[in-house]
Amino acid sequence: MAIDFKQDILAPVAQDFAAMDQFINEGISSKVALVMSVSKHVVEAGGKRMRPIMCLLAAYACGETNLKHAQKLAAIIEMLHTATLVHDDVVDESGLRRGRPTANATWNNQTAVLVGDFLIARAFDLLVDLDNMILLKDFSTGTCEIAEGEVLQLQAQHQPDTTEDIYLQIIHGKTSRLFELATEGAAILAGKPEYREPLRRFAGHFGNAFQIIDDILDYTSDADTLGKNIGDDLMEGKPTLPLIAAMQNTQGEQRDLIRRSIATGGTSQLEQVIAIVQNSGALDYCHKRATEETERALQALEILPESTYRQALVNLTRLALDRIQ
């Protein structure tokens, strides 16, 4: 039976989700009109808001009863996520995000960077309101690690010798770490330290699977579905897992073509590279790795007591994998 996002995932925290939106709207308020305009633009471009939903579900799965604290933490997660996307778009020179013009394309790089900084600062301002030093320390360290992941990705650009281990380090920092903050933070907030590690492992494996799936879709989907241009990763010279696996499975001219494409970037040979990726067994390997990460995520969840909220986290995990079924 197909999983319905609204009914099987969002419904248990729908009221809290609406309250979280209010915290976000308050969080992006500013005396500077341009800051508010840009913040509103990027926040409204949000997708399904999986990270704050995961945060709310994890909080309730841990037995959290303080609704306002959980709602505020979810808003903090979404503001941090939005800030990283704004900065990503500047670094990647992206003009499109989820089918909408990016902040840097609509205004300019300088404005986008500064508003991203504002969103991070405001998120920590809200975090201080929660009055929990363990939570504050976790988020401070985690935010540094997210930035380090982005720098690692920058270092790996145009480097065809990037290994799968390095790729996993990159995606842990740039993607999985914020998922970990969302769920581990919920356990801290709920005063349930025994659930910190299981929820961190769940979110880490979920984030890995989620990013691998995203990287698969860059070679199998279309611009309308992705909300960005097909082949963006290749154009930017990013050695993602489909390319790394394709190089492992090929030799001679095919392997050399992928290496050159990573080294130079651009999309002049995109069709040939897509064909090699699709015919080399690389996508099968990526699918296998995404499935393994998903299974590990689900195993970690088993430590939590049974509840509607835990089941919704299971549903979310399975739905993420369904994107490539």
Swiss-Prot record:
Enzyme class: transferase
Family: Belongs to the FPP/GGPP synthase family.
Cofactor(s), names only, from the UniProt record: Mg(2+)
Subunit structure as annotated in this protein's UniProt entry: Homodimer.
Residues that coordinate or bind Mg(2+) 2: 88, 92
Lineage: Bacteria, Pseudomonadati, Pseudomonadota, Alphaproteobacteria, Rhodobacterales
Organism: Rhodobacter capsulatus (Rhodopseudomonas capsulata)
Cofactor info, note text: Binds 2 Mg(2+) ions per subunit.
Molecular-function GO terms, alphabetical: all-trans-nonaprenyl-diphosphate synthase (geranyl-diphosphate specific) activity; metal ion binding
Cross-referenced InterPro entries: Isoprenoid_synthase_dom_sf (IPR008949), Polyprenyl_synt (IPR000092), Polyprenyl_synt_CS (IPR033749)
Protein name: All-trans-nonaprenyl-diphosphate synthase (geranyl-diphosphate specific)
List of residues binding isopentenyl diphosphate: 48, 51, 81, 98
Keywords: Magnesium, Metal-binding, Transferase, Ubiquinone biosynthesis
Top-rank lineage group of the source organism: Bacteria
Binding site for Mg(2+) 1: 88, 92
Catalytic reaction(s) noted: 7 isopentenyl diphosphate + (2E)-geranyl diphosphate = all-trans-nonaprenyl diphosphate + 7 diphosphate
EC number annotated for this UniProt entry: 2.5.1.84
UniProt cross-references to PROSITE patterns, sorted A to Z: POLYPRENYL_SYNTHASE_1 (PS00723), POLYPRENYL_SYNTHASE_2 (PS00444)
Keyword Metal-binding belongs to the record: yes
